[in-house]
Amino acid sequence: MAMKKFVKKRKKVNFFAKNKINYIDYKDVELLKKFISGNGQILPRRITGTSPKHQRQLAVAIKRARQMALLPYVID
């Protein structure tokens, strides 16, 4: 039986805590685009590494930006 290779996973870092960002602004479109998938969906915590508090704030900011037409709902 072949041995499986062990790959050490890199610990995900909370982007907002690392950069000391307290408020996630819905008008900061470039920052919000980093947390959206290619289809336009909000990326989950397990992928981005954000804390639960910042993930909730991020989701609210992305939804506000979508309503204000700063971000698209879907990306073609």
Swiss-Prot record:
Binds as a heterodimer with protein bS6 to the central domain of the 16S rRNA, where it helps stabilize the platform of the 30S subunit. The keyword Ribosomal protein applies. One of its GO terms (biological process) is translation. Keywords: Ribonucleoprotein, Ribosomal protein, RNA-binding, rRNA-binding. The keyword Manganese does not apply. PANTHER family: 30S RIBOSOMAL PROTEIN S18, SMALL RIBOSOMAL SUBUNIT PROTEIN BS18M. HAMAP family: Ribosomal_bS18 (MF_00270). The gene is rpsR. Belongs to the bacterial ribosomal protein bS18 family. Part of the 30S ribosomal subunit. Forms a tight heterodimer with protein bS6. GO terms for molecular function: small ribosomal subunit rRNA binding; structural constituent of ribosome. This is Small ribosomal subunit protein bS18. One of its GO terms (cellular component) is cytosolic small ribosomal subunit.
